[in-house]
């Protein structure tokens, strides 16, 4: 049996597991679990996408000279008409850079800098973060190798809108939607009940072992960052983590592959959005820029430092902080010369606990801005509609 045959067998097992998950015995479910299923059923998420999936990488490798209509953004959303970071006063601006060694040594300037970054930018880069550079390089290169496998080796891991887990090419289930120019792979690390090696690729041969080590290191880094964010809000160091569910947090990875694009001025690799989760730790492609962060009315192209992570605040931390920390809109541009690979690690709250502004951050002059909502309920928005700027978190602001 060759490696491809092994993958096909594993894939069938995965599909059977997914089918079995749907056949839930209501008699053995708690009210909380029944509520989860009801939420999912109301969303309309099923096992199939609304249209046949076309792999963006396959389109790019077919020597297209023009972009298919499904990927052409409306004029007002095209990067050519909205990018203004080439202006001299903007070109040298970058997101703040935080030295974690210095920060954890008690440097007050760094504490102030990361607090300002969370409040004003929603983004920062971290250096001296404790993750080995060799592991970062191996993670990026191994996933590049995965996307360079024959298409049939990847298709056995095709995902569905129900969980998004696996190999995918679209976000949202709206029929006829204008799509982004990317493929991706999505998988779970935490909770352990969702961590299933059979749903991880088996090729290249080292990918599962490498990915597991990478995930464990990023969970540690996420926990360390949470203590700093919590302290800078005037809370106990552990308090933000406790609001996430303590040790029962969620952690998942989306590996983004952005192929060369024949008309990059008409498309986006990822549409503007803020991340629905708690915190994102991004390993960017440090050879090819692509991430842009909205700062006021300006799109700033992030210049990634080698062996640095890009960290951004998600909607859940904005909610918990009662909007003291900001989840900021960002997008990805593509180019015609080079493909890009980035690894977005999502550090999220436990999916079934209510997330709401921390009581210590609510005052008579700053009442709670958001009603309680579980992360399971919240993230259905992006799973059904795809990236939509800041519209989701803003739609949940409580009326005064």
From Swiss-Prot:
Traced from the root, the source organism's taxonomic lineage reads:
Eukaryota, Viridiplantae, Streptophyta, Embryophyta, Tracheophyta
What is the organism field in this record? Arabidopsis thaliana
- Keywords (A to Z) from UniProt: Dioxygenase, Iron, Jasmonic acid signaling pathway, Metal-binding, Oxidoreductase, Plant defense
On cofactor binding, the record's note says:
Binds 1 Fe(2+) ion per subunit.
SUPFAM superfamilies in UniProt: Clavaminate synthase-like
Induction statement: Induced at low levels by wounding. Induced by methyl jasmonate (MeJA), infection by the fungal pathogen Botrytis cinerea and infestation with the caterpillar Mamestra brassicae.
- Per UniProt, residues of the Fe2OG dioxygenase domain are 248-349
GO term, biological process aspect, one: negative regulation of defense response to insect
Q: Which reaction does it catalyse?
A: jasmonate + 2-oxoglutarate + O2 = (1R,2R)-12-hydroxyjasmonate + succinate + CO2
Q: Which cofactor is essential here?
A: L-ascorbate; Fe(2+)
Q: What is its EC number?
A: 1.14.11.-
What the record says about disrupting the gene is: The quadruple mutant jox1, jox2, jox3 and jox4 exhibit reduced root and shoot growth, delayed flowering, reduced seed production, constitutively elevated jasmonate and jasmonoyl-L-isoleucine levels, and enhanced resistance to the necrotrophic fungal pathogen Botrytis cinerea and the herbivorous caterpillar Mamestra brassicae.
Q: What is this protein called?
A: Jasmonate-induced oxygenase 1
């Amino acid at each position: 049996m060759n490696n491809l045959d092994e993958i096909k067998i594993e894939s069938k097992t995965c599909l059977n597991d997914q089918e079995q998950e749907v056949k839930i015995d209501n008699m053995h479910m708690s009210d909380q679990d029944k509520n989860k299923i009801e939420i999912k059923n109301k969303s309309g998420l099923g096992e199939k996408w609304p249209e046949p999936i076309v792999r963006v990488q396959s389109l790019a490798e077919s020597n297209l000279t023009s972009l298919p209509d499904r990927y052409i953004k409306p004029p007002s959303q095209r990067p050519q008409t909205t990018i203004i970071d080439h202006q001299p006063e903007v070109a040298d601006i970058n997101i703040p850079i935080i030295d974690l060694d210095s920060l954890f040594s008690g440097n007050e300037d760094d504490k102030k800098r990361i607090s300002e970054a969370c409040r004003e930018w929603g983004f920062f880069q971290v250096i001296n973060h404790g993750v080995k550079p060799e592991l970062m390089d191996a993670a990026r290169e191994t996933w590049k190798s995965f996307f360079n496998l024959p298409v049939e080796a990847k298709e056995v891991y095709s995902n569905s809108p129900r969980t998004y887990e696996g190999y995918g090419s679209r976000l949202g289930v709206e029929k006829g939607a204008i799509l982004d120019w990317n493929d991706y792979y999505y998988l779970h690390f935490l909770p352990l009940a969702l961590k299933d090696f059979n749903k991880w690729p088996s090729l290249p041969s080292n990918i599962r072992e490498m990915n597991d080590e990478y995930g464990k290191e990023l969970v540690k880094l996420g926990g360390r960052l949470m203590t700093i964010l919590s302290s800078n809000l005037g809370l106990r160091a552990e308090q933000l983590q406790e609001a996430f569910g303590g040790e029962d947090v969620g952690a998942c990875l989306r590996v983004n592959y952005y192929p060369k694009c024949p008309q990059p001025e008409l498309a986006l690799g990822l549409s503007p959005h803020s991340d629905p989760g708690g915190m994102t730790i991004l390993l960017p492609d440090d050879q090819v820029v692509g991430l842009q962060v909205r700062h006021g009315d300006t799109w700033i192209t992030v210049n990634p430092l080698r062996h640095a992570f890009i960290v951004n605040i998600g909607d859940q931390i904005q909610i918990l902080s009662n909007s003291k920390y900001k989840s900021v809109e960002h997008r990805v541009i593509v180019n015609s010369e080079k493909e890009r690979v980035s690894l977005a690690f999502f550090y999220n709250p436990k999916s079934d606990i209510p997330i709401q502004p921390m009581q210590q951050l609510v005052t008579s002059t700053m009442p709670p801005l958001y009603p309680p909502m579980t992360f399971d309920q919240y993230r259905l928005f992006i799973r059904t509609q795809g990236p939509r700027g800041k519209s989701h978190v803003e739609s949940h602001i409580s009326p005064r």
